[in-house]
């Protein structure tokens, strides 16, 4: 007779790891996108500034 407890623990650990990955990846992707936008805006600003001067 096998125990259901190890399967239950494995399921909870897998679920916790999945939630952790989601909660870590989503802010990371958003942060990278925001940094990319910031760099692009800065490059565009300095390109326009160089054209004026």
From Swiss-Prot:
GO terms for cellular component: mitochondrial inner membrane. GO terms for biological process: mitochondrial electron transport, cytochrome c to oxygen; response to hypoxia. It comes from the Eukaryota. Its EC number is 7.1.1.9. This protein is one of the nuclear-coded polypeptide chains of cytochrome c oxidase, the terminal oxidase in mitochondrial electron transport. InterPro entries: Cox7e/7s. The gene is cxgE. It catalyses: 4 Fe(II)-[cytochrome c] + O2 + 8 H(+)(in) = 4 Fe(III)-[cytochrome c] + 2 H2O + 4 H(+)(out). Its main location: mitochondrion. One of its GO terms (molecular function) is cytochrome-c oxidase activity. This is Cytochrome c oxidase subunit 7e. The lineage of its organism: Eukaryota, Amoebozoa, Evosea, Eumycetozoa, Dictyostelia. Slime mold cytochrome c oxidase consists of at least seven different polypeptides species, subunits I, II, III, IV, V, VI, and VIIe/s in order of MW. It is found in: Mitochondrion inner membrane. Keywords: Membrane, Mitochondrion, Mitochondrion inner membrane, Translocase.
